[in-house]
Structure formats: structure tokens, C-alpha cells
Design a protein with these regions (language model features):
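Glycine-rich phosphate/diphosphate-binding loop of Rossmann-like nucleotide-binding domains
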Residues: 1-39
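Short beta->alpha junction loops
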Residues: 38-48
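An anion/phosphate-binding loop that grips the pyrophosphate of nucleotide cofactors and donors
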Residues: 60
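Proline/glycine-rich low-complexity loops and linkers
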Residues: 75-147
Length: 147
């Protein structure tokens, strides 16, 4: 089984931060017996991310995406995955509850952008995030598992 890592973020692409996520994920993939053949970094651009994702879907069984899940307007990973896979985004009620709780215990008022993190592609399995507000997802296609 082949795997590929796509890291999303202009700050990584420009070298403003070191891409430690790719190294961590590659090590975990190897430990799980998955062959990681490709690693790609793409900036916060939906069109370029879609192109990279389509290419990955042609050549890899498992695709891990890291980044682009935040509450800002340039965080477009889930939206792009949904579009490429022909899925609509829908609200995950459990994620909405977790986001509300995250902010309530900190006595912070969430913004409208925070709620977009509860949107997930239809049919995706939602992964709770105990360290922040953006849940992960697993989306299965006929050929791929996208995480």
C-alpha cells in the first residue's frame, strides 16, 4: 500500500516555518508498514491544492493532508477535498459541540469563522481533535483513503 503526504500552507512553502509535520507523518507511516513515495508542499491556494490532490489520488492509496484546517479564509483543505471528491460539505453536530465547549471553558466568544471548522465532506468519518478546534476527517473513495 502506497502513501503520500501533502502539507498545506504558504508559510511552509516560503520557508517561514519548518515542515516538522511531514517528518513526523512519514515516520508514523513507515512504522505502520506503509510506503511513503511522495511528499508535497502546496501553498494556501485551492486551485493548486486541487491539482496536487488529483495527482496524489492517481498514484497513491493513502493520502495524508496536514494544514489548511484553521478558521481563516485561506484555510481551504476540507473544502478542496470535498470538491475534488464530488462531495458537499455538511455540519457535523458533534464537532459543533466540541468547538462550543473549547471556547466556553476558555471564556472566549467564537467567531463565525470558527464554526466553519465543523463543516465536513459528506460521508467522511470525523476524527476528534483534543488539541484544538479543527477535527480531522477520513474520506474513502473508490481508490483512496484521504486523511
Amino acid at each position: 500500500m502506497t502513501a503520500e503526504i501533502i502539507c498545506v500552507g504558504t508559510e511552509i512553502l516560503l520557508g517561514n516555518i519548518v515542515n516538522t509535520n511531514a517528518a513526523y507523518l512519514a515516520e508514523k507511516l513507515a512504522g505502520a508498514g506503509l510506503d511513503c513515495y511522495y511528499q508535497t508542499v502546496v501553498g494556501d491556494n485551492a486551485e493548486r491544492l486541487a491539482g496536487v490532490l488529483k495527482c496524489a489520488m492517481e498514484r497513491s492509496d493513502v493520502i495524508l493532508l496536514s494544514g489548511g484546517l484553521g478558521p481563516t479564509e485561506d484555510d481551504l483543505t476540507k473544502e478542496t477535498v470535498a470538491k475534488v471528491c464530488g462531495k458537499n460539505l455538511s455540519v457535523d453536530d458533534h464537532s459543533m459541540e466540541r468547538i462550543a465547549e473549547f471556547f466556553a471553558v476558555r471564556d472566549i466568544q467564537p467567531t463565525d469563522n470558527n464554526w466553519k471548522q465543523a463543516m465536513v465532506p459528506e460521508g467522511a468519518k470525523v476524527l476528534d481533535n483534543d488539541n484544538g478546534t479543527a477535527p480531522g476527517i477520513i474520506l474513502e473513495t473508490d481508490r483512496n483513503r484521504i486523511v
